[in-house]
Curated annotation (Swiss-Prot):
A lipid is attached at residue 2 (N-myristoyl glycine). Pfam families: Pkinase, VPS15-like_hel, WD40. It comes from Arabidopsis thaliana (Mouse-ear cress). The gene is VPS15. This is Serine/threonine-protein kinase VPS15. Residues 1037-1047 have a biased composition (Low complexity). HEAT repeats lie at residues 383-421, 480-517, 524-562, 610-646, 648-685, 687-724, 727-764. Interacts with VPS34. Component of a complex made of VPS38/USL1 and PI3K main subunits such as VPS15, ATG6/VPS30 and VPS34. Residues 27-307 form the Protein kinase domain. One of its GO terms (molecular function) is ATP binding. ATP binds at residues 33-41, 54. Its EC number is 2.7.11.1. It is a lipid-anchor.
Amino acid sequence: MGNKIARTTQVSATEYYLHDLPSSYNLVLKEVLGRGRFLKSIQCKHDEGLVVVKVYFKRGDSIDLREYERRLVKIKDVFLSLEHPHVWPFQFWQETDKAAYLVRQYFYSNLHDRLSTRPFLSLVEKKWLAFQLLLAVKQCHEKDICHGDIKCENVLLTSWNWLYLADFASFKPTYIPYDDPSDFSFFFDTRGQRLCYLAPERFYEHGGETQVAQDAPLKPSMDIFAVGCVIAELFLEGQPLFELAQLLAYRRGQHDPSQHLEKIPDPGIRKMILHMIQLEPEARLSAEDYLQNYVGVVFPNYFSPFLHTLYCCWNPLPSDMRVATCQGIFQEILKKMMENKSGDEIGVDSPVTSNPMNASTVQETFANHKLNSSKDLIRNTVNSKDEIFYSISDALKKNRHPFLKKITMDDLGTLMSLYDSRSDTYGTPFLPVEGNMRCEGMVLIASMLCSCIRNIKLPHLRREAILLLRSCSLYIDDDDRLQRVLPYVVALLSDPTAIVRCAAMETLCDILPLVRDFPPSDAKIFPEYIFPMLSMLPEDTEESVRICYASNIAKLALTAYGFLIHSFQLSDVGVLNELNSQQISTTPASETPSHLQKANGNAQLQQLRKTIAEVVQELVMGPKQTPNVRRALLQDIGELCFFFGQRQSNDFLLPILPAFLNDRDEQLRSVFFEKIVYVCFFVGQRSVEEYLLPYIDQALSDQTEAVIVNALECLSTLCKSSFLRKRALLQMIECVYPLLCYPSQWVRRAVVTFIAASSECLGAVDSYAFIAPVIRSYLSRLPASIASEEGLLSCLKPPVTREVVYRIFEKTRNPEFMAKQRKMWYSSSPQSKDWESVDLFDKDAGELNSVECRAEQKQSVEGKKQIKSASKQPEVQGKYAEKDAKLRIPRNPRPNASNTVELRDPVYPEKLQFSGFMAPYVSGANSFIEPENIPLYSFSMDKRAATNPPVASESSLQMNSLGMGSLSVPWMDSMSKSFNLASSVPVPKLISGSFHVGTNPKQFYRVVHEPESRENDQISSAISKFQDLGVSSSSKSASVTSEDASSPADLVGEPSLSRTSVPDSGWKPRGVLVAHLQEHRSAVNDIATSSDHSFFVSASDDSTVKVWDSRKLEKDISFRSRLTYHLEGSRGMCTTMLRNSTQVVVGASDGVIHMFSIDHISRGLGNVVEKYSGIVDIKKKDVKEGALVSLLNYTADSLSGPMVMYSTQNCGIHLWDTRSDLDAWTLKANPEEGYVSSLVTSPCGNWFVSGSSRGVLTLWDLRFRVPVNSWQYPIICPIEKMCLCFLPPSVSVSTTMKPLIYVAAGCNEVSLWNAEGGSCHQVLRVANYENETDVSEFQWKLPSNKVNPKPNHRQNMSSKYRIEELNEPPPRLPGIRSLLPLPGGDLLTGGTDLKIRRWDYSSPERSYCICGPSLKGVGNDDFYELKTNTGVQFVQETKRRPLATKLTAKAVLAAAATDTAGCHRDSVQSLASVKLNQRLLISSSRDGAIKVWK
């Protein structure tokens, strides 16, 4: 082609480049790459991918291009025989009349572009590319082909650093004129920058006739010179070695490039480059000689044959197989790369020696891991994942935080001494990194993994690739970690597979602590890059990802803190290179926080802590928190405290601790008390005594032994560290010592350890003054030293059953007992302390075990006298012997009718009355006690509860044994709170743990805030409330009737009662409107209140469930709901709240039960809810039986978990265990009787009554799960609502034993039924103005119509199943829609006449209307007539003055719309009550309004 081509003229525009090319090539112009004068380079789209097209336009004289085409064919054919080529010739060419085209595959990157692209090439990568470039030239020269135009643009690179030499210039002239730069510019200066890579001998003198043929063949030495220039530019960070003028001067000997090469630090590289660019061509070596001579000097030994052969095997494999094979031979790769290091560098005494590995050995090793059995390889990849990473670094084996401070108990003392109060920090979190872990070759493996990680199809192989990157990161430098590996790891945080996201999270947290040196531009990598990318993980759909994030948040926090400290150091020093990783790691921890004194530094630290605090709060209290997530977060709570500092730990970590204990998960509570000791040291002594000790105190009564032991170990650690003051220590000893008789040896040993540590902390004198009198009753003898664990263990009395331990435990928490104990401690006569303690314990033990003793004695009076005389022996030895005997008695209580309560404590009857258990023993009702005389469907309590009377402070325990919490009883609130305050410290108390009797533990967790000064007031107010109920407070003549005793338990299973506690006796709402809540857009079908009355929820037809803060009902003018839960388009039919918890259960019209928890934070005195955090623990159950019709709490002593009974539209009745998420049992109602529209269950859980949509009421025996009685309501109509009837104390015991229920059905009436016989006792009728023809009284006189359970097959199917209702459903009769029972048989009702009435059972004439529309000209002058007919009592509401005109429903609605008192304007659907400063009535209506009355 020669100089003739140089005379061509300017050609057409680029739009016509492909105009002359045949359409069969299917090329589409995409981009113009180069506008050189000789060839135009364009990028085109082809069916097989992107291609580069070099275009030569023909102009002027015609030139024969066949010779150049022959050379292209030769080059292509020769290189086809290469097995693993580093050359890439032109693949296609085409000549047309106007142009010639050269086509090859497009490569994304060439060496020129790669040198200026992040991440910049590391030193070993540059050596690897130089090595491959020499290999490429060697392959060319071995085939007698010279390139002719080697430059950076013609060196192509793949993403995994495989090099190709392309664009062979067989058509360019070999020699060009020395004194005419036009030819150089035309052929070789494509960028116009005058860079020259040509050998000096390719320039000739232009004077006269030339002595050199321009088309003479190229020589290998010319390519070697160009290779030297490219390698020099590679190691000079893209700076060219020669420009044209410099090369010509160098040819004349007027330029020395060695000065420019001095910028290359490696002398071996400089020597090799200088040898390649010698002026004498003969002095230059061949490419093969350079490869051999500079092995070990420039090129590492493992480059050839090991690494090159490995890459040759990887090239043809897909990404998945590359990762799989890399995983299989990773250890061999690491071993080979570390071989050329000296013993000092790798941390051993002598250099590592190994057998040389040639190419065949490498291929054999690779083949052993390749596709002989690809499935086995992939399976081995999964099985051996741990061997890869954990066999590399001992540091990662031994410690979860290998390069960060791991907070242990041994280090806490030293750490506390480093605290800087001004900056609230504890020093730098980084630990030194060992220098012998550097292996530069790992960068090449990391680059290969990064190149294919996005194209891996199998998720487990993507995970393996991330783990391999984590392994490689141990051996590469900081810049490669941040610039090369980190972006790929962060990108995989959004991978669709959970295991990949987890692996990316773990790898991220393991890589970042390794970084010790980074440029100032990366100082804000955490706030601007890391944390935003992690923001979606707390709401990840997979729990495993959230657990992984929670377990690593402490690592992230400490690492971000270390980065922040280093950025301050960089700003102080000013020059990055002056700080290396060794200086950072050896900086004294006490000096590092001095940089945080700057205002900017403090602001950044506060912002960082705020960011981490938000993440922690989202994980702990967010909508997707689980016990496993919380447990993972607790594992590193010490590191989080280290990060937050003392002030932030108090301000942020302490308030969220109750959220951990509000969880039911036993393992979570166990881990909490295992790790809380770290929090104690960081928050300080005052916070421990005021906030954390009450938590530990309540953990001692937990049913899980691991929780108790961990709490005791925490106390022991605090004692050994002298962390507790004397007063706090004595208070904890008060709480702990009853556990000395715990049946588990594990717990007893933990108690002994704590007592011994306390003794050692107090000293010998105080130990015998304070500890010995308390524990003496539990020891057979006093040991020589209380501080000796072995001595205490050898002196312990035999253990007792767990029930007895909890009774003793609760007895010791009685304020009276604690007052006696403290009075004994601080008495002026120390010699009497021991004996007073013995007397005190005798009295307590006797009271606690009197029932057990009586149950095991015979019925004779002599036996009682023996017990009483034995308990009153004055001799100390006799007392000890009695205590030993009582503690050893096996607990097999059997009820005995003749047993009575022996009362030695003058206030003991009151205590029994408080707990609701006095009646079975003093009322003489043998039907409670005698097994053979127990009625089938009575209100009797569990036999186990009846034979084990409680102690005074056992209110919450006994309420739970009945299947209810003490907070479920409104009039028990103040008493139960005061009795549960076990410590005299006036700080928030946590009622946590599981008090239980027998086999029915009930767990509840609630923070109780009460001032100490109010305890006596609360007790006295509780006594006065019980006296108001008619309960005598005398000690001997207490006469409590059965209905009083059972009334607390009556809350169980009653639909409205289980949702809203039974209001106070004598409570008479006046109808004063307190609040009007109008957020629902449709009917509010049901209301449920929490056990502590702090909030209530409402379920509506508008597909929402709203949470309302009842504590602000009387305070806020603009009252709004706090939280809203959406039912996904279905209507909320019914709702209830599980007792002593914040869990809400909602039944929807689409047959789905929704259960969720309301997360809130309580602070200050009075347990005031400060913030509602959100709705958590969402659980859904699709019953697949149509709409949920009725829903209520069901709790019985024989059941361990919270149960929910519900009925469905398809006639199903189910009992759902909310813990196991399974149905305990399922019953089916008869379809001909209609679906079950209402349910009511007994307090003891032995029976329940169902009411159907066709007026059939059925009594079910739950012991055998069969219907035992069924009767038809006098009118065939739906049973709207049912509730239990709590009769007054004046009614005889025989009447109270009957299952009496109120039934709202029919037209404007409520009836009282005895479900045992199906007989009606009372009918309450509302005045019916629109239809004066009331139902005849005759139908109530008739005996109940028994429903035959056997179907009559002769009966017409249409009448049996009422098929006509499918065409036209029967209209609902106007009447009562909601019931709320009151003590003494009183009742609140609400219905379609928009009125709420209070019915008085004892004095029906005192019944009255609480609220309702005031009718014009009528007034609220209703009176209530009482009539009795054949045993049925009728209470009829009538007007004192007859109406002048007939009153219609439209007139009632018009009157309601103009009512000044604010009555309901539509049917009253639900009633509930809450007890705050005063009791309030809550009502909801069909128009979506909720009203609160007082």
